[in-house]
From Swiss-Prot:
SUPFAM superfamilies linked: Glucocorticoid receptor-like (DNA-binding domain), P-loop containing nucleoside triphosphate hydrolases
Residues of the ClpX-type ZB domain: 1-50
Subunit field text: Component of the ClpX-ClpP complex. Forms a hexameric ring that, in the presence of ATP, binds to fourteen ClpP subunits assembled into a disk-like structure with a central cavity, resembling the structure of eukaryotic proteasomes.
Coiled coil: none
Function: ATP-dependent specificity component of the Clp protease. It directs the protease to specific substrates. Can perform chaperone functions in the absence of ClpP.
HAMAP family: ClpX
One GO biological process term: proteolysis involved in protein catabolic process
InterPro entries: AAA+_ATPase, ATP-dep_Clp_protease_ClpX, ATPase_AAA_core, Clp_ATPase_C, Clp_protease_ATP-bd_su_ClpX, ClpX_bact, P-loop_NTPase, Znf_CppX_C4
Keyword terms: ATP-binding, Chaperone, Metal-binding, Nucleotide-binding, Zinc
Protein name: ATP-dependent Clp protease ATP-binding subunit ClpX
Length: 423
């Protein structure tokens, strides 16, 4: 004799002939109506959980946005470390703020919301005028991983050299191999003008991997999941690899683009420009009028140009700017060397004429502010050799004569007498 309870739904109690289907399991049965009801309950609870999660994300988003430095604050921070370049600092401040605002927004994006595109940056300007330093200073302020790569070291597949993914390896290393942190970092690719197509830029001698590298960089600039060889160099199946999503990595691409002024000048009808011309001293006026077609004529492919919607120029540093670079920033060279001497209990001072002489020597090297450290080092190195072993020296003053002699003519004042070190 059959027990009717074996044919009842364990949840609603309906018999099998009262429902469409009755699904049986070990010691339990459920009818089709209860299955539908259960699915509705699960869906309601899921939607409720998603709503709570969305509210939490939005609260967190507001909190992060409140903590994100505003463009004016970013500009003020850059102003403490970088002399001049007001327009570039303003452009970068806005671009970086919008980038990280977009990054926060992306975490709570739904299908119905407007998707914010990434805006990578192209910095154009002469060597040694602060392109890489600007990017580095931004990363330091935002406390995000930062990496610098030299475009000339990159090659396309099939050539000796580094794959483009190696720029991401440097970023991953700076993030202590924390992929999540690396995916919100900043990458600066310098010397990008050196991988221009030779056909459109006769002055560029290297073309073995020019257009090929540009093509290889397209995906990581736009946003892709890249396989990064943890051993560096070329990708190999035997090497361990990490997957990094570049969608939220900010790329700052920089180059001197020597000669592009002439391309711009020709297009807008100005006379030819040379390094000594008055017009070149106002190079930002020319660069402000740069168009994608100028970059294409220089040798960048259209697809590559399209991945760099923000273009800003770095201006030449004149003598007055260089003196300010020496003395005004928080980590100015003069301040650094004064600190080094103070650790030996000696005060260090510079005459204004000495600073002018140092700048004059640096300008002759034609490498911008980079030359300042090497000039300062050549002058101060002999002094720094002697000072630590002398306990009677209270202060050291660098004069124009000191600079002219490369360091041997130096007046040091102490409590008892003047000590002059000569050649």
């Amino acid at each position: 004799m059959t027990d009717d309870t074996e044919y009842r739904c364990s949840f609603c109690g309906k018999e099998h002939h009262q429902v469409d289907d009755l699904i049986a399991g070990p010691d339990v049965r459920i009818c089709s109506e209860c299955v539908v009801l259960s699915c509705e309950i699960v869906e309601d609870r899921r939607n409720e959980a998603l709503a709570k999660q969305d509210a939490f994300i939005k609260r967190k988003q507001r909190s992060v946005l409140e903590g994100l430095p505003k463009p004016a604050e970013i500009y003020a921070f850059l102003d403490e470390y970088v002399i001049g370049q007001q327009k570039a600092k303003r452009d970068l401040s806005v671009a970086v703020y919008n980038h990280y605002k977009r990054l926060v927004s992306t975490k709570s994006e739904s299908e119905n919301e407007v998707e914010l595109s990434k805006s990578n940056i192209l910095l154009i300007g002469p060597t040694g005028c602060g392109k890489t330093y600007l990017a580095q200073t931004l990363a330091r302020m935002l406390r995000v991983p930062f990496a610098v790569a030299d475009a000339t070291a990159l090659t396309e597949a099939g050539y000796v050299g580094d794959d483009v993914e190696n720029v991401l390896l440097k970023l991953l290393q700076d993030a202590d191999f924390d992929i999540t942190r690396a995916e919100a970092g900043i990458v600066c690719i310098d010397e990008i003008d050196k991988i221009s197509r030779k056909a459109d830029s006769p002055s560029i001698t290297r073309d073995v991997s020019g257009e090929g590298v540009q093509q290889a960089l397209l995906k990581i600039l736009e946003g892709t999941v890249a396989s990064v060889p943890l051993q560096g160099g070329k990708k190999h199946t035997q090497y361990e690899q990490a997957s990094i999503n570049t969608r939220n990595i900010l790329f700052i691409v920089a180059g001197a683009f020597s000669g592009i002024e002439e391309i711009i000048s020709s297009r807008i009808g100005r006379s030819n420009m040379g390094f000594g011309s008055d017009l070149l001293r106002k190079d930002t006026d020319v660069f402000d009028q740069i168009l994608p077609e100028d970059l294409r004529k220089f040798g960048l492919i259209p697809e590559f140009i399209g991945r760099l919607p923000i273009v800003t120029a770095i201006s030449h540093l004149d003598g007055e700017d260089m003196i300010r670079v020496l003395t005004e920033p928080k980590n100015a060279l003069v301040k650094q060397y004064k600190r080094l001497f103070s650790l030996d209990g000696v005060s260090l001072g510079f005459d204004h004429e000495a600073l002018e002489a140092i700048v004059e020597l640096a300008l002759k090297r034609k490498t911008g502010a980079r030359a300042l450290r090497s000039v300062m080092e050549s002058i101060l190195s002999p002094i720094m050799f002697d000072v630590p072993s002398r306990g009677d020296i209270e202060s050291v003053r660098i004069t124009a004569e000191t600079v002219a002699g490369g360091g041997p003519h130096l007046t040091m004042r102490c409590a008892r007498s003047n000590y002059i070190r000569s050649a």
